[in-house]
């Protein structure tokens, strides 16, 4: 089980990414459309002025139940251990155990 501080830190990062997403995208778009280096530098400085945790790459994929970061399934948002337990308990609709 991950520490609660790590889970809360990741939630805070997710909130910041949602808050600054449109501003960050518009700055990147304007920076790519400009031709002069000076204008690009201005947009680059504006991007750097945004909070560091507002970048999407800072979010870590962690299981929302256990907080485990390794063996994470993106489609379900849980780790493989939790996935297995929930599948055996029939808590994930549409999943069947294969046998041949």
From Swiss-Prot:
Any single GO CC term annotated in Swiss-Prot or TrEMBL for this entry: chloroplast
Keyword Chloroplast: yes
Entries under Pfam families matching the protein: Ribosomal_S14
Gene3D superfamilies: 1.10.287.1480
SUPFAM superfamilies: Glucocorticoid receptor-like (DNA-binding domain)
Signal peptide segment: none
One function term, GO molecular function aspect: structural constituent of ribosome
GO biological process terms on file: translation
Principal location listed in the UniProt entry: plastid
The keyword Plastid belongs to this UniProt entry's keyword annotation: yes
Subcellular location as annotated: Plastid, Chloroplast
This protein's UniProt keywords: Chloroplast, Plastid, Ribonucleoprotein, Ribosomal protein, RNA-binding, rRNA-binding
UniProt record similarity statement: Belongs to the universal ribosomal protein uS14 family.
Binding partners and assembly: Part of the 30S ribosomal subunit.
Function as written in the Swiss-Prot or TrEMBL entry: Binds 16S rRNA, required for the assembly of 30S particles.
Designated name of the protein: Small ribosomal subunit protein uS14c
Taxonomic source organism: Chara vulgaris (Common stonewort)
Gene: rps14
